[in-house]
Amino acid sequence: MQFLQEKVKLIKKEDPVMLKSPEDFPVYWFETSDSVSHRYQFQSDGHLSMKVVDDARPVPQKMVESFLNKFFPSGYPYSVNEGYLRYTQFRALQHFSSAALSVLSTQSLLFAAGLRPTPAQATVVSWILKDGMQHVGKLICSNLGARMDSEPKRWRILADVLYDLGTGLELVSPLCPHLFLEMAGLGNFAKGMATVAARATRLPIYSSFAKEGNLSDIFAKGEAISTLFNVAGIGAGIQLASTICSSMEGKLVVGSILSVVHVYSVVEQMRGVPINTLNPQRTALIVANFLKTGKVPSPPDLRFQEDLMFPERPIQDAGNVKVGRALHKAVKPSEVQRLKQVFVEEKFLLSHGKSWTDMVLEHDATGEDALRGWLVAAYVKSMTKIYNDPDDIILQDAYDKMNDVFNPFLSQVQAKGWYTDRFLDGTGTRFAW
């Protein structure tokens, strides 16, 4: 016992071992990915520094990855939705052709006005035409914002068609110099409308690719791509203007080709955009696919089925539904009370005609309400072909069938990534009791 006490005393008398604090040790580690080794270290101020230790990548791979880092969102391709690469490729071609065409039209404008392209004179022309007629076009087009929310793809295409129309008027202005002011003014009026439509539709298009809350990154990299190919297009336009397009005939031929390439590029861009909001056309396509196959398509699956030029055209397999007519025009006054009794808890009314079915929505109806109404209309359409029952019985049977399938149908819709909290029907008229 005495021996143990002496041993404990000896241990207590020994100097304690002094351990270094964590701050005395440099915190660093190495990460290797795709033949590149990086050394990461926390500095004394808490910031993380990175240094390339070894890079065994071949030069072409380094160049490609450097380009991707500068012009594509971080984490690409896993940080964006399907279709982004196709969209970006044709966006680059669109901006290249547009910039080249713009150079040719500017040259024609200056020539038609009898001006030399000096900075002072060019500024005067820009102020009179662009800051005048172009602003008028912007004001008129700004009233169509709700329609652009509903059909951003269609309006994006229309924006580029308007832009090419305006550029075309500028391009041919030297052929009729006595109408210079009228043609140049109309050209810039069309360009003003195109500018508003293009900018207004940019956000919903970019939003469709955001997968990890990275909308700002996608927007910034998209604008970087646009700037890069705009500069390249301006360079190509300057070269064309001094060679092939030095004559009016050359301008007309090359300008027509560039315009076709420009519009084709934007159409292909829009085919690659997987927008996940519900509008009349996408809702009808979802219902039609569900009734045919029992499955709901995802936004990437549905994008190639959309009619980009005539989206308001009714789809027969989904009940030939049209949305947006005023209640007093779509439904006979004598029918309103009867329809209210059928759809007593719903936020829509359906009026079946010979050629199509009108659906009128309440002011606070959502995408779910539109889906319910579309299903009823589609079931009525299919039952009418099979049964000879009175319209009231068919309508009630279709409504009951919709209620039976709606919950699993809605679960599929939401699981596929569709946003059902809103229904974008453009400037469609709604009602309130």
From Swiss-Prot:
Its main location: plastid. It comes from the Eukaryota. It is found in: Plastid. Several mutations in ASP2 (AC P46645), but not all, and any of the non-phosphorylated B6 vitamers can suppress the rus phenotype. Expressed throughout the plant, with a higher expression near the root apical meristem, in the cortex region of the root elongation zone, in lateral roots and emerging lateral roots. Not detected in extreme root apical meristem or root cap. The keyword Plastid applies. Keywords: Plastid. The lineage of its organism: Eukaryota, Viridiplantae, Streptophyta, Embryophyta, Tracheophyta. It comes from Arabidopsis thaliana. Involved in a root UV-B sensing pathway and in the protection against the hypersensitivity to very low-fluence-rate (VLF) UV-B. RSU1 and RUS2 are probably both negative modulators of the same UV-B perception pathway, which when overstimulated in the roots causes a block to postgermination development. Required for polar auxin transport and to maintain the normal levels of PIN proteins in the root. Disulfide bonds: none annotated. GO terms for cellular component: chloroplast envelope; plastid. PANTHER family: PROTEIN ROOT UVB SENSITIVE 2, CHLOROPLASTIC, RUS1 FAMILY PROTEIN C16ORF58. Pfam families: UVB_sens_C, UVB_sens_prot. The gene is RUS2. GO terms for biological process: auxin polar transport; response to UV-B. This is Protein root UVB sensitive 2, chloroplastic. Belongs to the RUS1 family. Interacts (via the DUF647 domain) with RUS1 (via the DUF647 domain). InterPro entries: RUS_fam (IPR006968), UVB_sens_C (IPR055412), UVB_sens_RUS_dom (IPR054549). Disruption phenotype: No visible phenotype under normal growth conditions. Extremely stunted growth, failure to develop true postembryonic leaves and arrested primary root elongation, when grown in vitro.
